């Protein structure tokens, strides 16, 4: 059997403040750190070993994986950070309070930006100092690849080629893997892995800091999947 752990980072400061976070590098809150540590204990109970751990470039995902390793006592020899696993870029909405934005633009418009599959928010100004093209961490990435705004579809088109080229081949070699990422990059991965339709994927809610354990056979057919913390589990939507 082959094991894949998918985990959304623990609660971040901007999650707590109900802001659109996107590519902003928000830190974990104390609650978020504790969520990550608890996730590590849950993973430890599985009694598995992992050779690869993946995270995005963003600190909330990196620190979540670090805290998982701390409490699980896992020794993962290969830790890989990939910007392709970053959160969806929320464009000009980044940093705005979600409730206040709904009051300004209307609930319907904000829900289209947040939950439609293929409608991105207005783009972030390239002159914004927080635009990723102006940050040192992304200086070695082709500027043409750096988004100003993304829909969930755009996030899927960024994340899944990386998964197919770099993660799926490892699974096919029977490597156990942990991926620490974000709500929307994990939606993209779940859409691919579970073959969820465009219409249904927008309804998938993934809680912070709760590991999803997926078990495959050697042909990557899914044998089982579940949240390790059943008290905070969200229902999977596995529909075509």
Please describe what each predicted stretch is.
Residues 39-132, 138, 191-215, 222:
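Phosphate-coordination/substrate-recognition cap region in phosphate-metabolizing enzymes
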Residues 2-3, 39, 85-100, 148, ...:
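Acidic, low-complexity terminal tails and accessory targeting/binding regions
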Residues 112-116, 121-123, 135, 141-161:
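Internal catalytic-core helix/loop-beta-alpha segment
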Residues 9, 84, 182:
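Active-site glycine-centered loops adjacent to acidic/histidine catalytic or metal-binding residues
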Residues 55-56, 179-181:
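Short beta-strand scaffold positions
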Residues 3-9, 179:
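Short, hydrophobic/glycine-enriched beta-strand segments
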Residues 11-67, 71, 146-163, 203:
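Loop-to-helix element that buttresses phosphate recognition and phosphoryl-transfer chemistry
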Residues 12, 185-186:
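Short active-site segment of divalent metal-dependent hydrolases/proteases
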């Amino acid at each position: 059997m082959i094991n894949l752990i998918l985990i959304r980072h623990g609660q971040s400061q901007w999650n707590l403040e109900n802001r659109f976070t996107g590519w902003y590098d928000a830190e974990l809150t104390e609650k978020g750190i504790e969520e990550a540590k608890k996730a590590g204990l849950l993973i430890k109970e599985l009694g598995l070993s992992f050779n690869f751990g993946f995270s995005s470039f963003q600190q909330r995902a990196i620190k979540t994986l670090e805290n998982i390793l701390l409490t699980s006592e896992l020794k993962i020899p290969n830790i890989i950070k990939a910007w392709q696993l970053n959160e969806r870029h929320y464009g000009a909405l980044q940093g705005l309070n979600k409730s206040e934005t709904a009051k300004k633009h209307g609930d319907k418009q904000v829900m289209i930006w947040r939950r439609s599959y293929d409608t991105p928010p207005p783009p972030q100004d390239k002159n914004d100092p927080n635009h990723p093209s102006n940050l040192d961490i992304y200086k070695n990435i082709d500027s043409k690849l750096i988004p100003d705004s993304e829909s969930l579809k755009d996030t899927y088109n960024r994340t899944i080629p990386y998964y197919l080229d770099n993660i799926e081949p490892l699974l096919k070699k029977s490597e156990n893997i942990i991926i620490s990422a974000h709500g929307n990059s994990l939606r993209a991965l779940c859409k691919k892995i579970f073959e969820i339709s465009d219409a249904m994927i927008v309804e998938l809610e993934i809680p912070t800091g709760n590991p999803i354990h997926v078990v495959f056979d050697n042909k990557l057919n899914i044998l089982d999947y579940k949240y390790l913390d059943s008290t905070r589990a969200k229902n999977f939507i596995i529909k075509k």
